[in-house]
UniProtKB/Swiss-Prot annotation:
Disulfide bonds: none annotated. It comes from the Eukaryota. Keywords: Cell membrane, Cell projection, G-protein coupled receptor, Membrane, Receptor, Transducer, Transmembrane, Transmembrane helix. Disruption phenotype: Reduced brood size, which is in part due to an abnormal distribution of male-derived sperm in the hermaphrodite uterus following mating, with sperm moving at a reduced velocity, reversing course frequently and accumulating at the spermathecal-uterine valve 1 hour following mating. No visible defects in oogenesis. GO terms for cellular component: dendrite; perikaryon; plasma membrane. It is found in: Cell membrane; Perikaryon; Cell projection, Dendrite. GO terms for biological process: sensory perception of chemical stimulus. The chain crosses the membrane at residues 23-43, 62-82, 103-123, 142-162, 188-208, 238-258, 275-295. The gene is srb-16. InterPro entries: 7TM_GPCR_serpentine_rcpt_Sra, 7TM_GPCR_serpentine_rcpt_Srab, 7TM_GPCR_serpentine_rcpt_Srb. This is Serpentine receptor class beta-16.
């Protein structure tokens, strides 16, 4: 065994047994386990029982399933580390085996990029719903579903094959979330590409929301079109919150890891455990998976409340006699006024 590998083994062993590193990792594991249940509950309660368009339901389900699988795999990566503790005799025994490492790490990367691209296609789907406002409610087919599955699963897999073509899974690592040697440059390109794609998606989402808000008071739109407009406004607000939070955490991760990789800090000189602990803190995906169903539940609950209030308001309007006539005339007056103000 060469001297360089011995030094790596000592550093990695010291990191794995570091109290700070274990506390951070364990906190993220708790968040991951919790998010498995909260995301599953959200899918069952808020997605499958919703009145959303089938295409949007599919993309939203895929997005939350990607978060569930990531949380499951992140927990598995910690269990792999615990397994190495049980067999620990020398410093190099702390490194995870190649095959489990390759399987878990590749799957984690796939979940992350599937989630990133799925949120972009949720924006594209809302754009199509805005363009085909009168017919989109009844516009779904097997080919649409197949296309979304292709772009949200096959495309991320193809990008990962490109990024990991020179991956060395024999790299000595203590956790499956650490990328292998040979992928840093291409992986950074993918992260930056997905980040700027998310910025463009957020800008497009605001344009879609603005267009739907402008259409909301137009009197010539059919009942089906009005329903689609209201759904577009509600869902774009909901997606915006997810995109913004994801972008904030992506910025923290990208800037944090770039800074640690390219600049030296006195606190981390000859202190590999502290450096590894801070890098793990910047890996905010478990925190995002934990917050996402909570924030999404809040937005969709508010959406339901608004729909109930609109329905109660309509039911409270008088429909007979002089009061009914006055109420109807007032509704027409309000609609015409809003229409010509546009």
């Amino acid at each position: 065994m060469d001297r360089e590998l011995i030094e790596i083994c000592k550093e990695n062993s010291a990191t794995a047994f570091s109290v700070g590193y274990q506390i951070v990792y364990l906190i993220y594991v708790v968040l991951s386990v919790t998010s498995i249940f909260t995301c599953s509950y959200f899918i069952k309660t808020f997605i499958w029982n919703s009145t959303f368009h089938p295409n949007f339901k599919l993309l939203l389900t895929m997005y939350f399933f990607a978060a569930i699988f990531h949380s499951f795999l992140f927990t598995a990566s910690y269990l792999m580390m615990i397994e190495r503790f049980l067999d620990y005799q020398t410093d190099c025994d702390i490194h995870v085996s190649m095959v489990p490492y390759a399987i878990v790490h590749s799957s984690i990367a796939c979940c992350l990029f599937c989630g990133m691209l799925t949120q972009v296609f949720m924006v594209i789907e809302r754009l199509l719903a805005t363009i085909k406002i009168e017919s989109y409610e009844h516009n779904t087919s097997f080919w649409h579903i197949l296309a979304y599955l292709f772009f949200c699963i096959v495309l991320p897999l193809s990008l990962l094959v490109w990024a990991y073509q020179d991956a060395d899974y024999n790299s000595p690592v203590i956790t499956a979330i650490s990328p292998p040697k040979g992928v840093e440059i291409r992986l950074n390109i993918l992260y930056i590409f997905c980040f700027f794609l998310a910025i463009l998606a957020l800008i497009l989402l605001q344009v879609v929301r603005f267009v739907n808000k402008r259409r909301e008071s137009r009197i010539e739109i059919s009942l089906s079109g009005r329903f689609q407009i209201v759904e577009n406004i509600d869902t774009t607000t909901f997606i915006s919150s997810i995109l913004i939070i994801n972008m904030i955490m992506s910025v923290i991760y990208i800037v944090g890891t770039f800074t640690l990789r390219n600049f030296q800090f006195d606190a981390f000189i000859n202190n590999q455990p502290a450096l590894a602990t801070v890098k793990t803190i910047f890996y905010l995906h478990p925190l995002f998976s934990f917050l996402m169903p909570l924030i999404s539940s809040y937005h969709l609950s508010k959406m339901r409340e608004r729909r109930v209030k609109r329905r109660e308001h309509l039911m409270a309007i008088k429909t007979k006699g002089r009061e009914g006539s006055d109420a109807y005339n007032q509704l027409l007056h309000d609609q015409w006024t809003q229409h010509f103000l546009k």
